[in-house]
Amino acid sequence: PYRRQRQMCIRDRYYVIAPVILITTFVISMFLFIYTLLRRWFKAGRTASVAVGTVLTFAALQFTYKPSDSFYWYNGAIYYTFFFSLMLFLFTSVITIIKSENTAARVICSVLSMPLAFMIGGGNYATALFTSIILVLLTAWQIKHKDKSFIILAVITVLSLVSLGISVMAPGNAIRQASVGAGPGVLKALVYSFAYGAYNIADSTTFPVAVMWIALLPVFYRIAVSSGLKFRFPAAAIIFFYCVYCAQGTPVFYAQGIHMPYRMMNIIYFAYYGFMTISLIYLSLIHI
């Protein structure tokens, strides 16, 4: 008994490492993703990219729904928050592959992206599905624009989809599904996803967060101007972004109905900041 108690004491003593790992990876990945998105995709200035990345990362960390489930509960958070952070690292690498003119940077990011995509595909279904959807869309975009980077993107996408497929077909899923009962079906899961997406956006836009977005609007407008991008169908694009955003909730609603754990709610909340940033910049482009 003494030996077992001693082992538990040692384990608890080192448990403090968990939030350090989870918070550090989240902060770094969130900042790098926002910075790279603005700097490379929208051609924003370095100062604006750093400022927006810092503000959004701080807000996402500060106003997390349930910090205990995202950063302090290792067993739950490592499978959700940590994998979400890996997804952001992957998207940062993919943007670099598409937009960077530095061959070495593109090669390094390509090498890093392949194992990352395979690993994420085998993680929680929300992040795995969302990642695969984004990768498919980016690959299609590159094919349409006849960019040679579509080849490596296609490889990364296939790795993500194969990993997700293996995860879905794993025998343990049937056992787990039997223990929670039958889900509501595909149609209801989609309805729940769209409803929760709207609720999540409204609930996440608290007064301080709304003030933050208003304060960032002039910055987003300048970024939109510097990007040189133009879009002809703003309403359709925002609806499309919203559909992709809502897809995160579909796996859990399909499997468990309307019961969503906080750790799942947290990663959808984190994605809210990326969705709002892209949408607000896009809306700024309408008048240019």
Report residues per predicted region.
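Perimembrane helix-loop-helix junctions
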Residues: F130-S160
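Single conserved hydrophobic/aromatic residue that forms the stacking wall/gate
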Residues: P1-R6, I10, I286-H287
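Transmembrane-helix motifs of polytopic, lipid-linked glycan transferases
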Residues: I21-T47, A51, F89
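Membrane-interface alpha helices of multi-pass inner-membrane proteins
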Residues: V107-V136
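Membrane-interface micro-motifs in multi-pass membrane enzymes
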Residues: A48-I95, N124, C246-I281
